[in-house]
Amino acid sequence: MSCVNIRGCCIGEGRPKVIIPIVEPTETAVLEKAAEFSALRADCVEWRIDCFEGAKDLPAIVHCAAKLRVALKDKLLLFTFRTKSEGGKVALAHEEYLHFIHTVFATDCADLIDIEFFTAGAELPALIEEAHTAGAAVVCSSHDFHKTPPRAELVSRMVAMQQAGANLPKLAVMPQSRTDVLELLAATAEMADRHPETPIITMSMGALGAVSRLSGEALGSSMTFANPGQASAPGQVQLDIVNEVLDALHL
């Protein structure tokens, strides 16, 4: 599997890199969390802007982003606006979403930016190219909070993300059975073995799928989201447990 190197952090090499989310509503609370998180054992902090009370206030986002970048020191910063249709807090019209993405580019604060595969639509390749020009790597994401599509569909979706230029295709799906968890894990291994052009991020959500958040090094997922006290998605495992298990399973 290839490696995405950001700030000396090689995503896709060795131990899966750990992401912890900031889901606070105010700038003050966001920055307090950032100061706390800067000392934790995690590689990347995700700012979930849809949880921010100024989620549609672009100047407020820009203002907070600059302070957040400083507060996190050397940790990677991932900007994410999870739309309501993909499990987030706020609904955005297509043009609003595009405007948000361009605003993040202009901050010059993002190490990584999440761009939703289906929300971006036909604009996806151009957005990814613009992100790269702005110096940000792209996590191209797709979330299904109701089901787990068949393995072939999961693989083809991640390949399409690669072909659009994404640095890190990401899939999060909801299992309805143990077989669904295995389907996601099989798709992950297939991508890592047959389409190693980029690292990938995958997870099966909820308690049933939690094993997928811990098995990435063996099966091919390069990053995992951990719960530092407040989860941003169902099934996120506590940060200290994630680190303990990743250490124990390190190849």
Question: Where are the language model's segments positioned?
Answer:
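Glycine-/acidic-rich phosphate or pyrophosphate-binding loops and their flanking alpha/beta elements
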Residues: 6-7
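Active-site beta->alpha loop and helix N-cap motifs at the rims of alpha/beta catalytic domains
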Residues: 2-3, 13-133, 143-148
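Catalytic alpha/beta core domains of metabolic enzymes, predominantly
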Residues: 102, 112, 117-251
